[in-house]
UniProtKB/Swiss-Prot annotation:
Family per record: Belongs to the bacterial ribosomal protein bL27 family.
Family annotation (Pfam families): Ribosomal_L27
This protein's GO CC annotations: cytosolic large ribosomal subunit
Domain of life: Bacteria
InterPro entries: Ribosomal_bL27, Ribosomal_bL27_CS
Origin species: Clostridium botulinum (strain Eklund 17B / Type B)
SUPFAM superfamilies the UniProt entry points to: Ribosomal L27 protein-like (SSF110324)
Protein name stated in the entry: Large ribosomal subunit protein bL27
GO MF terms, alphabetically ordered: structural constituent of ribosome
Gene label: rpmA
Entry keyword Signal: no
Keywords (A to Z) from UniProt: Ribonucleoprotein, Ribosomal protein
Chain residues in the propeptide: 1-9
Lineage, highest ranks first: Bacteria, Bacillati, Bacillota, Clostridia, Eubacteriales
Amino acid sequence: MLIMNLQLFAHKKGVGSSKNGRDSESKRLGVKSTDGEFVLAGNIIVRQRGTKIHPGNNVGRGKDDTLFAKIDGVVKFERVGKDKKKASVYPVNVEAIAE
């Protein structure tokens, strides 16, 4: 009796998938209004995670730690002690600037 042993092998190599190729979208954090810049009430001064820069005079802090201006004025970044910074907004006479 004739016994045939037929074995089929793969004609293409098995290919694994790569674990690369994805990244999270950037969050666009950082300083949005620079020192000495005129801002309107509600303008964002700094977008941040945590309180890297603390709110100073006339500056509010949002629930995501974003600092924003409470009044129209000029932004000033100041040091508090040795290792802390704060952002403040000081009112400015708009008529004096226009002249």
